[in-house]
Amino acid sequence: MLQKIDPKTLTMNPFTLIGDQWLLITAGTPEHCNTMTASWGGVGVMWAEPSATCYIRPQRYTKEFVDNNDYFTLCFFDESYRKALNLCGSTSGRDVDKIKECGFTVQAGAGNAPYFAEA
């Protein structure tokens, strides 16, 4: 279940979390979405608000979903999901239903943005 977390209470190292453990960027709706693995980006503060910065190449299928929706999610997983994260980073959602292949359970978050129950 999705829980709202005050970013100021986070104790994990963002360099390890993003750079070593990776994350999934997901956008669309719970019924029709796409996801991609990322191992780059950043977190910080912009205009006194917590923020995350994501960089997505224009040719990525996920970028179409991010551009066409108001919300997207960033999901982090433990090491047992490394194989799934590899799949999501090495195949295109145009060709493969990555979410089905990984066995992820899609949930609706803020703004109906899709996220994964397993994260």
Protein language model features and the residues they cover:
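Active-site-proximal mixed secondary-structure blocks
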Residues: 1-119
